[in-house]
Each structure stands twice: as structure tokens, then as C-alpha cells.
């Protein structure tokens, strides 16, 4: 899950309450919380019951990739999530984290260890939003059309529509949850055609973008 920042909000004044150092590691983190994350919208993953989708290709796709943990919704504490992003900082190849006086780091490798996912057979470095190739062939393979990006109007089959919704909410949860953007189209195509996806690097990349 990740927040959508609300930047450009009114700056806190000198009359603002003193920093609560049980919640924030510094005054700067407190300011970041009030300026960006306090009113941020938290994007929540959807709980997906694979046993209800056994008549589709979806369970096999997630089981063969060992991604089933990404479909299990856990308890959500909105205040902790917002504090996490306010206190976190990107330090090269890791994220320095601080939550309620507990310090830790997040790396691509720590995400992989937590999710118990095998790494790809070879490094995959291209981020989906940086992919410049034409997506026309991908769209046609998926059953869509280039002129339609709204999930309400794309002429997907029921199976593909379900897979796309799972992908958008649980694997690529950025701001607009009703649009199949070009990066999401590439991700969905790679998922559907069984291409290797470095999901741990992808999650790490999305986390860094949200900080």
C-alpha cells in the first residue's frame, strides 16, 4: 500500500503544537507529515480469494510466481502508514525507516526475503514508466484497444478484467485505480504472457517514489 501525497498545502505556523518525538524522528519529519502525508489518501490492496477464481488462469499465475502473499490483506493502521512515510528517507539502494522509535531499513532483498519469492533468473532493470516501446501489440494480445484506457470501457474478457483489477490494486497501486496506463499495460502483458517480473524491485521502486 502507498499514500498519495497532497503537496502545496498551507505551511504550519509557529503556533503549531510541538513535535511528538514518539511519532517523528525529527522536526523535519513532523513537517513532512503535516505538509504532505496528514491528508494523504492511502491506497489499500484488495483481499483476493484464489479459490473463488479456480476456473480462471489467475491462481496458477500467482502460485507459479510465489506471489500469493501479495493477495492477503493485512490489518491497516492509517496513522502508522502516514508516520512511516513521513519518517522514511531514500538512501541510495535502501530506505532508512523509523517507526515509533524502531529503526530498520528496507531493501529489495529484504522485500524478497519477507515475501519468500525467488529472484528473476537475470537482472531486470527497466522500470515500467521508462519503457518506450510501442504497446499496440500488447494491448491487442490482452484483448483491449489503444483508444480505451478506462477499466469501465476496455473490452476485456471477464477473466482479463479480473486479472487487470487484481494487478492495479495489489501489484501497481498508483494514484488512478480505474485507468490502465501504458506502464500498467506493460506489467499486465508481462504477467499474462508469463514473462519474468522482478516484483521485489518493482515494490521497492514504488515505495521510493512515494517517499
Question: What is the meaning of each model-derived region?
Answer:
Residues 2-211:
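A structural signal for long, well-ordered, hydrophobic/aromatic- and basic-residue-enriched core segments
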Amino acid at each position: 500500500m502507498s499514500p498519495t501525497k497532497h503537496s502545496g498545502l498551507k505551511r504550519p505556523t509557529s503556533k503549531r503544537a510541538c513535535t511528538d518525538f514518539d511519532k517523528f524522528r525529527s522536526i523535519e519529519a513532523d513537517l513532512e507529515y503535516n505538509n504532505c502525508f496528514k491528508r494523504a489518501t492511502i491506497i489499500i490492496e484488495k483481499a483476493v480469494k484464489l479459490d473463488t477464481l479456480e476456473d480462471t488462469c489467475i491462481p496458477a499465475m500467482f502460485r507459479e510466481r510465489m506471489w500469493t502473499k501479495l493477495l492477503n490483506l493485512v490489518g491497516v493502521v492509517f496513522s502508522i502508514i502516514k508516520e512511516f512515510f513521513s519518517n522514511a528517507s531514500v538512501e541510495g539502494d535502501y530506505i532508512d525507516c523509523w517507526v515509533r522509535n524502531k529503526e530498520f531499513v528496507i531493501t529489495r532483498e529484504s522485500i524478497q526475503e519477507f515475501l519468500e519469492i525467488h529472484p528473476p533468473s537475470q537482472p531486470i532493470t527497466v522500470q515500467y514508466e521508462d519503457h518506450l516501446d510501442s504497446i499496440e501489440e500488447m494491448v491487442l494480445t490482452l484483448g483491449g484497444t489503444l483508444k480505451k484506457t478506462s477499466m469501465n470501457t476496455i473490452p476485456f474478457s471477464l477473466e482479463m478484467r479480473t486479472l487487470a483489477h487484481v494487478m492495479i490494486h495489489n501489484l501497481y497501486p498508483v494514484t488512478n485505480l480505474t485507468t490502465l496506463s501504458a506502464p500498467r499495460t506493460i506489467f499486465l502483458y508481462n504477467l499474462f504472457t508469463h514473462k519474468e517480473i522482478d516484483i521485489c524491485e518493482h515494490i521497492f521502486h514504488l515505495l521510493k517514489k512515494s517517499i
